[in-house]
A protein has these predicted regions:
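Pre-NBD coupling/linker segments of ABC/ABC-like ATPases
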Residues: 2-5
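ABC family nucleotide-binding domain
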Residues: 9-212, 218-219
Length: 282
């Protein structure tokens, strides 16, 4: 039987450290080493201040490490002479706020990263293809304020794909959306990952979002403290939340065992009910 060849490594960090502050030091990253293969769909979880966004900034050449190295597509980020060109051709970004220019149409917003790289005809062709890809082929002449929040984020995804980069970095791309729109956006990213082979790294606080990806990296205090492969039993939802530092939001009651009122993804809520039922029977 022929074995499926292993995907090449697209991203590698080696002992990556980022320290901020002239007085009291803040270690945003503390010796992070990881590898991400081409074609993976990965989420990064953890409490606020755990280093998630800093890690994305390092990979995307938006910040410099204090020590350690970052390789993306075989390139040492620190040795790049033109980081703008690298970001334009190799990495696309999708943030919590879409940052679309309000006076430009959806199509024109998508064409912005291609200016200087493609002629007008090629830009028009590519933007039309991308709007079809994200399900907005009939919205190309709409302004951002004529689109829903989920549609605006889809335009932002299309814009990130404009120059066909192998890597897309998403910092809370579903954070401003309701749960239904968030699931739809993650479904879109999954479809693009499968059909185009684009690698995605997505920062999120939402375990339901994480479960739509292949691998979850959990960070705390600037380190990767846990790694989960998606597809584990229902109880793993609770483990993921607890280890990511979000467990306090699940079970953080008084000494009498009372739980605070919160909203959880359905699978995590089922796990909570199961554990509470077992506790009541004991």
């Amino acid at each position: 039987m022929n074995e499926t060849p292993e995907a090449p490594c697209l991203i590698e960090t080696r002992d990556l450290t980022r320290i901020y502050g002239d007085g009291e030091e803040i270690r945003a990253l503390d010796g992070v080493s990881l590898k991400i293969a081409a074609g993976e769909l990965v989420t990064v979880m953890g409490p606020s201040g755990s280093g998630k966004s800093t890690l994305l900034n390092m990979i995307g050449a938006l910040d410099k490490p204090t020590s350690g190295t970052v390789f993306v597509d075989g390139q040492d980020i620190a040795a790049l002479h033109n980081k703008d060109e690298f970001r334009s051709k190799t990495v696309g970004f999708v943030f919590q706020l879409h940052n679309l220019i309000p006076t430009l149409t959806a199509r024109e917003n998508i064409e912005i990263p291609m200016i200087g790289h493609k002629g007008l005809g090629a830009r028009r062709k590519r933007s039309a293809e991308l709007l079809e890809l994200v399900g907005l082929g009939d919205r190309m002449r709409h302004l951002p304020n004529q689109l829903s929040g989920g549609q605006r984020q889809r335009v932002a995804v299309a814009r990130a794909l404009a120059n066909n980069p192998p890597l897309i970095l998403g910092d809370e791309p579903t954070g401003s959306l309701d749960s239904e729109a968030g699931r739809a956006l993650m479904g879109l990213l999954h479809d693009i990952n499968q059909s185009q082979g684009t690698t995605f790294i997505v920062v999120t606080h939402d375990v339901a979002v994480a479960r739509q990806t292949n691998r979850v990296l959990v960070m705390a205090d600037g380190k990767i403290v846990r790694e989960d492969i998606i597809g584990s039993p229902i109880e793993e939802d609770l483990k993921m939340w607890r280890h990511s530092g979000l467990g306090r939001r699940i079970v953080d009651g008084d000494h009498d065992g009372a739980l605070k009122a919160i909203t959880l993804p359905d699978r995590a809520m089922d796990a909570v009910r199961s554990l509470l039922g077992a506790a009541n029977r004991s």
